[in-house]
Amino acid sequence: AKGKKVISWNPGWNYKAGEVDMMQMWSFRGKVTPGIPHIDSKFHYTNHFDTFADLVALYDRKIYNLTEQTDDVVGSIVALWHDRLLSTEENMVLENNFYPSMLALAERTWLGGGSQYYDGEGTMLWNENTETFKNFAAFEKRMLIHKDKYFQGYPFGYVKQTNVKWNITDAFPNGGDMGKVFPPEEGLKDSYQYEGKEYGVRSAIGAGIYFRHVWGGLPTSIPTFYKDPKENHTAYAYTFVYSPKEQEVGMWAETQNYSRSEMDLPPKQGTWDYRGSRLWINDEEIAPPTWTATHTTKSNEIALGNENC
């Protein structure tokens, strides 16, 4: 009517071909109805995204597991549903990594292709020899050129991550004791013996490594570093940082990806989180910052503070 077209959510009403102009698949339950054009936004909700890890999955994914457009699958969007109160409009763009996500999906939808859907390698860059890594590293280089050339003065928090390499242990069972000490604290090795069992070490690349994704409990979980992460376990991750000179630098560190649509509480002062996480640099323990948010009542009407990097 009046030249307007209607887009409806899927899942939603069970439309038949000819009853609606287009549908947006917003949930993992969404499936194409033949004869209706669809937009794919499954797991594209940037308000749940980590700045680094989720961008890998977003760039590498096939649109609805297809390599090119069809009559029934015509494109894709990122969705930003920020349910927490905001102190400034700029924070909505910055906290949800909007511009990097926009550029990643714009290139993917323009080129088509991709090597996986969200349930392939997920958010992981395992090693430099894979096509996934090479393609993402090339995109990252182009994106950072755009950041310097076209996004000066805009809230664009992303920095290079393809040079960040980690060694991460298998998770040790802690029996609910989050302060329990395990062999990696005595010295770093390629593997560890603990209570008659061997615990290995694997490598991963990136500035954000999920041990368990926010969508990890869904029937179609997004894969992370651990295939089947369990509660009451302790893991160790370590990396090498080189400085060509003695200097003071800032540090971007977080142990939890704060969704901007949940009522998560800030950590208690003097702690990194509610899981007993700890950080060291050259064997010197790093204390957490003073958290700017101090509320103890869960609410979407209280803005996130500096606990949300």
Pin down the residues of each PLM region:
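Active-site neighborhood of glycoside hydrolase catalytic domains
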Residues: 1-21, 28
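Accessory carbohydrate-binding/adhesion or oligomerization-edge regions at the termini
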Residues: 143-225, 291
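Short beta-strands within extracellular/lumenal beta-sheet-rich domains
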Residues: 226-243, 300
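Short, surface-exposed tryptophan/glycine-enriched loops
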Residues: 293-309
